[in-house]
A protein has these predicted regions:
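Glycine-rich, basic loop-to-helix element that forms the pyrophosphate-binding segment
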Residues: 1-17, 27
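Active-site-adjacent helix/loop segment of glycosyltransferases
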Residues: 140-188
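A short, conserved alpha-helix in the catalytic core of glycosyltransferases
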Residues: 97-148
Length: 188
């Protein structure tokens, strides 16, 4: 069977889902109590909320953030919010550009309305693309710090930085810009 990457795998799960919400959770995470309840509470706060992302804590340094949502720069770079910073600095819920696909809840109906994860991404930045599309459609992505997971990071690919991961991240960054950014911003 062909390896369809992260996107192909989650799209298959979403296609089979018969629930109002779907939760994506990486295989290198350890979930803390109240994870599901906190994500559900966050996404149910408004019908305009498309996704709610968990506080992802560095598995090896449990006092530090691995990801607290993503932000996107004017130059087209996605950045993991809070990476390496103390947990205490990220205890407040807030809007984010996108939620990390490693520990997130989505509204199934809106996922279907906006279309599946773009399988041309294969892996990496597909969650930023999904967050971008949600914003284009007028929806909100939020950070739910009460939902917590410990995240090893790159357990599937072996290392944080390897040739394939760097290639996919660079390629997907360019594709993300081309696909979603307004034409006038591309000229900057």
């Amino acid at each position: 069977k062909e390896n369809t990457g992260f996107c192909g795998a989650v799209n298959e799960g979403i296609r089979r889902a018969d629930t109002p919400y779907v939760i994506l959770l990486n295989n290198d995470t350890e979930v803390l109590p109240e994870f599901v309840e906190e994500l559900l509470a966050a996404i149910k706060k408004s019908d305009r909320i498309f996704s709610a992302g968990a506080m992802m804590i560095d598995y090896h340094d449990r006092g530090r953030i691995d990801n607290a949502g993503d932000y996107y720069t004017a130059f087209g770079w996605a950045v993991a919010r809070g990476k390496g910073k103390p947990l205490a600095e990220f205890n407040r819920p807030c809007r984010v550009f996108s939620c990390c696909g490693g520990a997130v809840i989505y509204r199934t109906g809106l996922l279907r309305e906006m279309g599946p994860f773009d399988e041309r991404h294969f892996a990496y930045l597909e969650d930023v693309d999904m967050g971008y599309r949600a914003k284009i459609h007028g929806y909100i992505n939020c950070y739910a710090p009460g939902a917590r997971v410990y995240h090893v990071g790159s357990a599937t690919t072996g290392t944080r930085y390897n040739e394939k991961k760097v290639f996919l991240a660079a390629r997907n960054s360019m594709y993300l810009i081309y696909k979603n950014m307004p034409f006038l911003q591309l000229l900057i």
